[in-house]
Amino acid sequence: MSKGVEFNRLMLDMRAMQMDAMSAPKPVSGAQEAGASSFADMLGQAVNKVAQTQQASSQLANAFEIGKSGVDLTDVMISSQKASVSFQALTQVRNKLVQAYQDIMQMPV
């Protein structure tokens, strides 16, 4: 059940980050700050994180299938669902980006 506790902690961390982001508006500047990551970097990191989540889920499922001790079915299912949800979220982000690109391309100049 340690994965359940880990999931709850992850959700609490995400909510805390969301509240921090919403509470402190940042000034808009024309130049990018030194050391600040671009949107492309953030998107690349998100893709890598989803790939790592899927790989970890696959490894856990394989360990369960071969009967490795200490691997519980609930852990496998939770890991699989995490990978699925993260992939679906990434797919939605991609769809929104494609739609935004198409909208911009259809704008009259």
Swiss-Prot record:
GO process annotations (BP): bacterial-type flagellum-dependent cell motility
This protein's record includes keyword Protein transport: no
Domain of life: Bacteria
One Pfam entry name: FliE
Keywords: Bacterial flagellum
Gene Ontology CC annotation, any one: bacterial-type flagellum basal body
Main location class: other
Family: Belongs to the FliE family.
Annotated protein name in UniProt: Flagellar hook-basal body complex protein FliE
Protein species of origin: Pseudomonas savastanoi pv. phaseolicola (strain 1448A / Race 6) (Pseudomonas syringae pv. phaseolicola (strain 1448A / Race 6))
